[in-house]
Amino acid sequence: MKRTPLFEKHVELGAKMVDFAGWEMPLYYTSIFEEVMAVRKSVGMFDVSHMGEFLVKGPEAVSFIDFLITNNFSSLPDGKALYSVMCNENGGIIDDLVVYKVSPDEALMVVNAANIEKDFNWIKSHSKNFNVEVSNISDTTALIAFQGPRAQEALQELVEDSLEEIAYYSFKKSIVAGVEAIVSRTGYTGEDGFELMIEAKNSPKVWDALMNLLRKIDGRPAGLGARDVCRLEATYLLYGQDMDENTNPFEVGLSWVVKLDKDFVGKEALLKAKEKVERKLVALELSGKRIARKGYEVSKNGERVGEITSGNFSPTLGKSIALALVSKSVKIGDQLGVVFPGGKLVEALVVKKPFYRGSVRREV
């Protein structure tokens, strides 16, 4: 299994390590519950260095990325980041990603850990007609997420530039704990917070400095368990569970990242798909505390209407919650049933998304 440059730090902290997409990653340090609560009330710090980073440089960097992704990258100012998906020619989602516009001829793409090789090959295969150079810098790049309502006040102590001046989905090159870093106001938890992109060799030093901050504010290092709970509570999608190459953006509530007034890979397929959307992703609150797993059948009045894509117990809400891909006829307020192993039917209410709205800044 692969290890991030912060692996030894996790071991020192006594983390429970697990295999995630071929990476040995911390599931939790003390408990998922405590780590979720730290994110919601103070700060949780995540090692997300398993994520992939690609550098795109060249005079046609912007137009190239605009061709690859569904969202509009060409109109983005320097210093801003953008959430989007990449689709194949059939309109299926290859990956969801965040793209950073550094300058008119330089951009950074951050992709999911499980898709690094697939994405890089896909991107390279489409680069031949553009004057660009694409580099996979994942192995030399570390990424640390510092997330929670107290993230700004705590982190400011270590950052040379004003964090207040970094707007939501914006970033700045700065110095953090004496180390060069890209500091972005982005995250995957539903809270305000920052992600720090640094050279892998410098990451242990930055991690230690951040740990010292956490001790002052009752913050905690947090593992992938808490990350999954937080993202589900905030109703952020997880690639490979809530979406994949067999789903299109319209089915999973991502129509807002599809800009059909420009050209991109998969546009023709998505123009057709938009006219005949038969499924949608809905939020469910289940009775009791049992956790619905991916693939569990979802029924309405005894008839199958879809299946669970993600499920977990929400410590913040004190409820079992899930996302499900179901028939478009299902609506908020409907009572559905989730079929658990052994045939037990658990009641589930379709609720408005998101389950939880935290301190994340909404202005873009």
UniProtKB/Swiss-Prot annotation:
<dbReference type="GO" id="GO:0005960">
    <property type="term" value="C:glycine cleavage complex"/>
</dbReference>
<dbReference type="InterPro" id="IPR006222">
    <property type="entry name" value="GCV_T_N"/>
</dbReference>
<dbReference type="GO" id="GO:0019464">
    <property type="term" value="P:glycine decarboxylation via glycine cleavage system"/>
</dbReference>
<dbReference type="InterPro" id="IPR022903">
    <property type="entry name" value="GCS_T_bac"/>
</dbReference>
<comment type="similarity">
    <text>Belongs to the GcvT family.</text>
</comment>
<dbReference type="InterPro" id="IPR029043">
    <property type="entry name" value="GcvT/YgfZ_C"/>
</dbReference>
<dbReference type="InterPro" id="IPR006223">
    <property type="entry name" value="GCS_T"/>
</dbReference>
<comment type="function">
    <text>The glycine cleavage system catalyzes the degradation of glycine.</text>
</comment>
<dbReference type="InterPro" id="IPR028896">
    <property type="entry name" value="GcvT/YgfZ/DmdA"/>
</dbReference>
<dbReference type="InterPro" id="IPR027266">
    <property type="entry name" value="TrmE/GcvT_dom1"/>
</dbReference>
<keyword id="KW-0032">Aminotransferase</keyword>
<keyword id="KW-0808">Transferase</keyword>
<dbReference type="Pfam" id="PF08669">
    <property type="entry name" value="GCV_T_C"/>
</dbReference>
<dbReference type="GO" id="GO:0004047">
    <property type="term" value="F:aminomethyltransferase activity"/>
</dbReference>
<protein>
    <recommendedName>
        <fullName>Aminomethyltransferase</fullName>
        <ecNumber>2.1.2.10</ecNumber>
    </recommendedName>
</protein>
<dbReference type="InterPro" id="IPR013977">
    <property type="entry name" value="GCST_C"/>
</dbReference>
<dbReference type="GO" id="GO:0008483">
    <property type="term" value="F:transaminase activity"/>
</dbReference>
<dbReference type="GO" id="GO:0005829">
    <property type="term" value="C:cytosol"/>
</dbReference>
<comment type="subunit">
    <text>The glycine cleavage system is composed of four proteins: P, T, L and H.</text>
</comment>
<dbReference type="Pfam" id="PF01571">
    <property type="entry name" value="GCV_T"/>
</dbReference>
